[in-house]
A protein has these predicted regions:
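Carbohydrate-associated surface elements
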Residues: 20
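Conserved donor-binding/catalytic core segment of Leloir-type glycosyltransferases
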Residues: 43-59, 65-68
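Short hydrophobic beta-strand element within catalytic cores of glycosyltransferases
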Residues: 149-153
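Conserved acidic donor-binding segment of nucleotide-sugar-dependent glycosyltransferases
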Residues: 164-165, 169-175, 184-189
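A short, well-ordered alpha-helix in the C-terminal region of glycosyltransferases
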Residues: 191-205, 209, 216
């Protein structure tokens, strides 16, 4: 966020106000996770990767699909679940078919039921979100509500608050980098659990907390204004 402001020429002071998340903190039960695996025919033990967002190329879905191809070619077992819809959905599906990864990638379409969506978050081993377009990676915080860590591009807005291997995982904006990170962490359940818990404790914020933070900041601005000579003017 700060880098985006600097790029357009803003050099003043700033305070970043975090977006809140409407999903509560939730630990999915083993039965919830088994339900998702049964629904999509995913055997127990195979790592589940997740993307949630609009089906648009600017979300770097090409990087995700190319990474899936690299993982398949290397012999890595996994399933990538892609949740969302959008005007480029058909083109994205055709590209996945062209890469011959239809046995590894599952397109669910849009999921409007927020409780169902949260079960997907909680079932996944990791969220894969290499978008550099988003000014705030809300899905990263949604995943954190279920203690699911995210892979994000270093120095992107989505990476704000992410420390590599502590509250998430950082990659370069390339399919090879994404594939390399996935392959390195997919079987390390202890690492995924620890980083997921850290994400929940450090980057998750509820809307109530976000509103309280914004309210306090506005109050500070109002108090500062009232303490200046401007308060002598009556409007």
């Amino acid at each position: 966020t700060v880098d985006s402001l600097r790029k357009v020429g803003y050099e003043g002071d700033y305070i970043v106000m975090p977006n809140g998340c409407d999903l509560p903190k939730l630990d999915c039960t083993e039965e919830m996770k088994a339900m998702i695996r049964r629904k999509h025919g995913i055997p127990e033990g195979i790592p589940i990767l997740l993307f949630v967002g609009r089906m648009m190329w600017y979300k770097n879905l090409r990087i995700i699909l190319d990474a899936c191809r690299l993982l398949k070619e290397s012999g890595r077992e996994y399933r990538m679940i892609i949740i969302g819809m959008g005007p480029e959905e058909n083109a994205i599906k055709k590209y996945a078919a062209k890469l011959n990864i239809g046995d590894k990638v599952i397109f669910t379409g849009q999921i409007l039921d927020r409780q169902e969506l949260q079960i997907y978050y909680g079932t996944a081993d990791m969220l894969v979100f290499p978008s550099t377009f988003d000014t705030n990676g809300l899905v990263v915080r949604e995943a954190a509500a279920s203690a699911t860590p995210a892979i994000v591009v270093a120095n992107s807005c989505a990476s704000e608050g992410i420390t590599d291997c502590e509250t998430g995982f950082l990659c370069l904006e390339s399919s090879r980098s994404v594939a390399k990170v996935i392959d390195r962490i997919a079987d390390n359940k202890d690492l995924l659990h620890r980083v997921g818990q850290n994400a929940r404790n450090n980057i998750y914020i509820s809307w109530d907390e976000s509103i309280a933070t914004a309210y306090n900041r506005y109050q500070t601005v109002i108090d500062k204004f009232n303490s200046t000579f401007h308060n002598k003017y009556k409007y």
